[in-house]
Amino acid sequence: MEWSEVEVHTTNEAVEPVANVLTEFGAAGVSIEDVADFLREREDKFGEIYALKREDYPEDGVIIKAYFLKTTEFVEQIPEIEQTLKNLTTFDIPLGKFQFVVNDVDDEEWATAWKKYYHPVQITDRITIVPSWESYTPSANEIIIELDPGMAFGTGTHPTTQLCIRALSDYLQPGDELIDVGTGSGVLSIASAKLGAKSILATDLDEIATRAAEENIRLNKTENIITVKQNNLLQDINKSDVDIVVANILAEVILLFPEDVYKALKPGGIFIASGIIEDKAKVVEEALKNAGLIIEKIEQQGDWVAIISKRGVE
């Protein structure tokens, strides 16, 4: 088989939207080369598995590489893929010095290239995300989430995902019922299940994402707790007693359904919203307040924000 590599040079803020677009066009795997991963100070908890080399990373920004079977259909789609990525600026997503390059690669190169940049990542004192092909020995009481990022939508390493997982660690109680809106890879649902949630509904509008989530959920043996549904946000989800709703999606999308979140939550229920770039945080905060939600806490990592709000006790 012949493969093509699509290489996109962009900003850290654009990583997840760009990766999602590439996956929606049929990418079989996505790798992310972010210089911030190298420059960020980390305690080397993972030995050689976690070793990073400066030469593996760009001078600035982020390089995203996606791998496609080189078919006639893909070749014809190349201009559309590039234009769709450029159109992300209409959502106020900064692309930086955007560069879009397509190269041919052989089978062996494709099979290993994207795995080079994905390593175990400790999200909290208790939770570590581990690529499915790595051997990793957890410490006592450590929660391991196995992911195969070749399938779709997020590896758990992006700041917005980390913000959500930390908030779940703080607010989720054993036995809680939860809805994960825009589940992507399923990582937040899996984390919630392993933190003790009793029942989880994971929704995503994209069929590729729901299939990826189902596979990752099976990989983590949490399918008895998590139900995956292809669905548009909370549309036609007739629930009014949910303990937590979590959504790691763009601010513009969060603005579409705060009233539905309010209706889905039981009194005292928590809404964890992330995927919010810093300059959109105030707009989202006001929309949540206007829907009747009470702001509990605002957390920030880099340019990204998570807003935790709750429905008042009536």
UniProtKB/Swiss-Prot annotation:
Subcellular location as annotated: Cytoplasm
Binding site for S-adenosyl-L-methionine: 161, 182, 204, 248
Major localization listed first in the record, in broad terms: cytoplasm
A GO-annotated cellular component: cytoplasm
Enzyme class: transferase
Keywords associated with the record: Cytoplasm, Methyltransferase, S-adenosyl-L-methionine, Transferase
Record flagged with keyword Transferase: yes
GO MF, one example: protein-lysine N-methyltransferase activity
Cited Pfam families: PrmA (PF06325)
Reactions it catalyzes: L-lysyl-[protein] + 3 S-adenosyl-L-methionine = N(6),N(6),N(6)-trimethyl-L-lysyl-[protein] + 3 S-adenosyl-L-homocysteine + 3 H(+)
InterPro entries reported in the protein's UniProt record: Ribosomal_L11_MeTrfase_PrmA, Ribosomal_PrmA_MeTrfase, SAM-dependent_MTases_sf
One GO term of the biological process aspect: methylation
Enzyme Commission code(s) on record: 2.1.1.-
Stated role: Methylates ribosomal protein L11.
Family named by the database record: Belongs to the methyltransferase superfamily. PrmA family.
Protein name in UniProt: Ribosomal protein L11 methyltransferase
Gene it is expressed from: prmA
